[in-house]
Each structure stands twice: as structure tokens, then as C-alpha cells.
């Protein structure tokens, strides 16, 4: 009798534990069908969309943004982006690019390397799959290399669509948010996904990734800083209130913020967003085949490449005229961007000189706050890809405020340096090239590149083989 009671009690405890675990952090989906993250799995079902997605692989060339603008090496001194920052390529390369960047370094096992698991979060439909299977804590916990063999398929179908729904299986879009942290963010700004209009949903699925975010808690989980809103001021206020910083600047020791790519936020504030012109209208237009079939072109790209299907739907001006307008705005934004950079770079070096001259934390605190705010505003504008087209007025206003904050910092620094007996201009080292700027910071680029090469040659092939074996066991062959 006692043994029977013990067995029943153990079974009951196990059942309760199972229920608690399954309800924790979105741990298990109510759906019994496993999500298939392989984009090729939908090639027949959505042939037009798949065949138009594949050419996102055409953007083979890697453009080095640091080589183009070495100021950014100094602006991100002490942070991973000073090592390596390339311009965005097509979705097809999402996995390759995050593996190959120096920012993820060269982990030798699942517990090494500088980056958290969160760095996969916008790279693959495997992320949503793993969250379903292991819960949010199960996904986010640990280092980036921990699930390298699990995160294998580049950005694609199951990132933005409910691929298991009858709507999708019958040829419909079935737009979906596939990550719980995005659902919470949309709720925070009063836009629950299920209540959104079709147009808003088309923007929100892009807003799963083309946004500002940060890592929080023990697991370094992704969170969008939208609790107070999505403008540059509202997010700055949020970060200041919680005392968050991404890193401490190597030169100035300022507690810095690294804007990611707040395209969704700046789009909302710009003329296109306010007029409900959404991402797909310009970057994934509806096109018509010769047989009259209409479908959404999934080769995300420049609207000028498909002018008649994009811009011409709203604008009466010629392609040449609109291109000239956009080029002019881009030049204006670039000019203000470089102006802000020169001021902020100088502020970092002047702050470093103030520390060297014996400045105290109390003396430096308001100066470092100005530098933090200046660079946050600069980064918010320049990290939002295409802001010169999405919201040029937002870019110019925000960059103007970055210049103002940097000027505030430098004015205070002039007084503080004079107080310490320094009245000559602070010398800035040679930062005319990417290599020179990295050298000025004492960065061992050869060592980093060798470490990355070893990782790509030894660790990544094992990941790929393990993934191949797992997918062969879990899914039907393609």
C-alpha cells in the first residue's frame, strides 16, 4: 500500500512539474505539427514566392562599412562593432554572415565565445522552432555557439508566416509573429498583432527584426525598449531609467548605447509610415506573371529596381526625378552624419584626456551622459538602414540633436580641461583608415582573424553535419 501511494504521489508530482514547465516561457506549442524551418520545404506550395526569395543570394559582395567610414571604429571602441561591421546583404546570407563576422569571434565549444544565444534571434526560422521546443529560457540560455548545429536555415518562410495553418497550406499568406518577445513588444505599444490591420501586420512581421533591441536578464534574452514608446527620446528615457548600457567606451569610459537597426521605429515616424505605406509596398511589391498570376515578390530589394511596381503606384514623378530627390536627401543625411561623428569622436578623446588629467567620476558624470546621448542619437539615425528614404526629416532632426549633445559635452570638457591646466587642443591619433583606427585602439586584428579562420574550418563543419543528420531524422526528404 505504501509503495502504491509513493508511486501515485511521484506520478502526480511529475504531472504537475510537466504542466508547470510546459506553460513556462512559451515552452511548448499547442500545435502537434512540428514547424519545418527549411525554406525549400515550401518551394512547391508557394513556388512563385520561393523562386523570388532565392535571388536574395545575388548580393554576393561584402561591403565593409568600417573601411568606408573609419570614424565608426572609434565610436564603437571597446565594442564588437569596432572589429567588424559590414553593410547588410540578402536574407539568404543571414546564417553565413553571423558566423563569419569577427563580432561572434571563434568559439571552440558550446560554452566559449563572447556573444549570447540572442545573437541568432533574427537570423533563422530555426529560432522560433527551438523556442517552441525548449521555451524561451531554453533557447536564450548560454553562449552563441551552444546551438550552432540547431540554427541552420537562413531567414525565410517560417519567420513571417504560420506555415502550419490551413490558410498557408491553401496558398494564403498567414502572416505571423513567430517570437514571443516580439508579441510582448507589440502589446507594449498598444498594437497586439491579432488586432492589427492587414497593412500593419505586413509591417510588423518585418518589425520582428528591423528594430532596436537589447539583451536583458541572466539569459541575455531579447527585449525591445518600447515600454515608453518608439521615438529616440522615449527609448533614451527608458534606457536611462533602468540604468542600461551596452558597454563602456574604451577611450572616454562613457556608458554607451548601441542602436541596432530601428527601421520599424523610424518608419513609423516618417512620411511613409504615417501614410500607411508599408515595407512590402516598396521592397516586396506584388507583381504579375505572364499568365496573369499575381504574387508578392520575395526578393527584398531597392524599390527603384522595380519602379513601376513600387514608386509609380503612388508617385506621378518620373523615376529620374524621384531618384534625384532621394539622392539629395541621402547627401544631406550623410553630411549631417559626418558632422555628428567628428564632434562625438573629438568628445571621446577629450574625455579620455580629462581622465588622464585627474578628473573625478563626479566631474565626468554629466559629460559622459552627454556623450552617451549624442552617440545614441547618431546611431539611432545611421543604423536605421534607408532612413534617408523612409524618414529623412527624422534622420536630420535626430542627427542635429546628436550634434547638440556632443557640443554640450565638449563645452563642459573645455572648462574641465582648463581647470586641470590643459588649454591646448587634444590631439587625435591617425584614424584616417579602418586599420589605422583599429591600431590606435590597440586591437589585435591578426589574432582575431586567425581565431575566426580556425573556427570556420573546425567548428562550423561539425555544426553543418550534425544539422544534416538531425533534419534527415526529423523531416521528410526534399
Curated annotation (Swiss-Prot):
How the cofactor is bound: the record states: Binds 1 Ca(2+) ion per monomer. Binds 5 heme c groups covalently per monomer.
InterPro entries in the record: Cyt_c552 (IPR003321), Cyt_c_NO2Rdtase_formate-dep (IPR017570), Multihaem_cyt_sf (IPR036280)
Tell me the compartments it is located in. Answer: Periplasm
Q: Which GO terms describe its biological process?
A: anaerobic electron transport chain; nitrate assimilation
Going by the UniProt record, its keywords in alphabetical order are:
Calcium, Electron transport, Heme, Iron, Metal-binding, Oxidoreductase, Periplasm, Signal, Transport
- For heme c 2, which residues are the binding ones? 157, 160-161, 298
What EC number(s) is this enzyme filed under? Answer: 1.7.2.2
Q: Which family does it belong to?
A: Belongs to the cytochrome c-552 family.
List the protein's name: Cytochrome c-552
What organism is recorded for this protein? Aliivibrio salmonicida (strain LFI1238)
Amino acid at each position: 500500500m505504501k509503495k502504491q501511494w509513493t508511486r501515485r504521489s511521484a506520478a502526480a508530482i511529475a504531472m504537475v512539474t510537466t504542466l508547470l514547465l510546459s506553460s513556462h516561457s512559451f515552452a511548448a506549442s499547442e500545435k502537434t505539427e512540428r514547424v519545418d524551418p527549411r525554406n525549400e520545404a515550401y518551394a512547391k506550395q508557394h513556388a512563385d514566392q520561393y523562386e523570388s526569395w532565392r535571388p536574395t543570394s545575388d548580393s554576393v559582395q561584402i561591403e565593409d562599412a568600417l573601411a568606408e567610414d573609419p570614424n565608426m571604429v572609434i565610436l564603437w571602441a571597446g565594442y564588437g562593432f569596432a572589429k567588424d561591421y559590414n553593410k547588410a546583404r540578402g536574407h539568404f546570407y543571414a546564417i553565413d554572415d553571423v558566423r563569419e563576422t569577427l563580432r561572434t569571434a571563434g568559439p571552440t565549444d558550446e560554452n566559449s565565445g563572447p556573444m549570447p544565444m540572442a545573437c541568432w534571434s533574427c537570423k533563422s526560422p530555426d529560432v522560433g522552432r527551438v523556442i517552441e521546443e525548449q521555451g524561451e529560457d531554453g533557447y536564450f540560455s548560454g553562449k552563441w555557439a551552444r546551438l550552432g548545429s540547431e540554427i541552420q536555415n537562413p531567414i525565410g518562410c517560417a519567420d513571417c508566416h504560420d506555415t502550419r495553418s490551413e490558410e498557408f497550406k491553401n496558398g494564403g499568406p498567414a502572416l505571423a509573429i513567430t517570437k514571443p518577445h516580439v508579441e510582448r513588444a507589440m502589446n507594449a505599444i498598444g498594437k497586439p498583432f491579432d488586432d492589427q490591420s492587414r497593412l500593419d501586420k505586413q509591417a510588423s512581421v518585418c518589425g520582428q527584426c528591423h528594430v532596436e533591441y537589447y539583451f536583458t536578464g541572466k539569459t541575455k534574452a531579447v527585449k525591445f525598449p518600447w515600454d515608453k514608446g518608439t521615438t529616440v527620446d522615449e527609448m533614451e528615457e527608458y534606457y536611462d531609467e533602468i540604468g542600461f548600457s551596452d558597454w563602456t567606451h574604451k577611450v572616454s569610459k562613457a556608458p554607451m548605447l548601441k542602436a541596432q537597426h530601428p527601421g520599424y521605429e523610424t518608419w513609423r515616424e516618417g512620411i511613409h509610415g504615417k501614410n500607411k505605406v508599408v515595407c512590402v509596398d516598396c521592397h516586396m511589391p506584388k507583381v504579375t506573371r505572364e499568365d496573369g498570376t499575381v504574387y508578392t515578390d520575395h526578393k527584398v530589394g531597392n524599390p527603384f529596381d522595380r519602379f513601376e511596381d513600387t514608386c509609380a503606384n503612388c508617385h506621378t514623378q518620373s523615376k529620374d526625378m524621384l531618384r534625384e530627390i532621394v539622392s539629395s536627401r541621402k547627401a544631406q543625411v550623410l553630411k549631417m552624419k559626418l558632422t555628428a561623428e567628428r564632434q562625438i569622436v573629438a568628445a571621446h578623446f577629450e574625455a579620455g584626456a580629462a581622465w588622464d588629467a585627474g578628473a573625478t567620476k563626479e566631474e565626468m558624470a554629466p559629460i559622459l551622459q552627454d556623450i552617451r546621448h549624442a552617440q545614441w542619437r547618431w546611431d539611432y539615425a545611421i543604423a536605421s538602414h534607408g532612413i534617408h528614404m523612409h524618414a529623412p526629416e527624422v534622420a536630420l532632426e535626430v542627427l542635429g540633436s546628436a550634434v547638440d549633445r556632443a557640443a554640450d559635452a565638449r563645452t563642459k570638457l573645455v572648462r574641465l580641461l582648463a581647470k586641470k591646466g590643459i588649454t591646448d587642443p587634444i590631439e587625435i591619433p591617425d584614424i584616417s583608415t579602418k586599420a589605422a583606427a583599429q591600431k590606435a585602439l590597440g586591437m589585435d586584428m591578426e589574432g582575431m582573424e586567425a581565431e575566426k579562420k580556425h573556427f570556420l574550418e573546425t567548428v562550423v563543419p561539425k555544426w553543418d553535419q550534425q544539422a544534416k543528420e538531425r533534419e534527415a531524422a526529423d523531416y521528410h526528404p526534399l
